[in-house]
Amino acid sequence: DFDSIVERKHTHSTKWLKFSDPNIIPMWIADMDFACPKEITDPMRERVDQGIFGYTDTPDELTQILKDRIKLRSGWDIEEEWVVWVPGAVVALNLACKTALAPGEIVVTPSPIYAPFDDASENMARGMVKNFLIDNNGRMELDFDATEELLSKDTKMLFFCNPHNPGGTVFN
């Protein structure tokens, strides 16, 4: 719904709290000012109305839906045990650094990138090298030659954001 205005300035919104100047339109964070669709809010209301917020398991069918989507989009048939559900991308980035890298090992991170990608290796006391994106007619792209030059015996992981944030480049 692009026509309804949702006032968020007094809701502790990170986006709107950053700048006090009312003439600044904050576009520094991927936080949209659109109302959430009823298909999402109605089931949430049902859960709230139930009045109990105990522990919840991830529905088995959700993993199968993910497997089917990956197979459809990429032809890759993943194993169910490869899927680990986490509460968000930032948690996943930190877990990836902690579990896939030993101390002293390095992740290659495109730059610029959403800050939590940069933060994850530091949070987990792992190494990082930046692979600076190149401008190709206004489109931010990976420099594959530079990526190859950054590889070493200690490089064990490449962070990848698709679509890329910032810039919006969709890699395929």
Features from the language model and the residues they span:
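Conserved core of the PLP fold type I
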Residues: 53-172
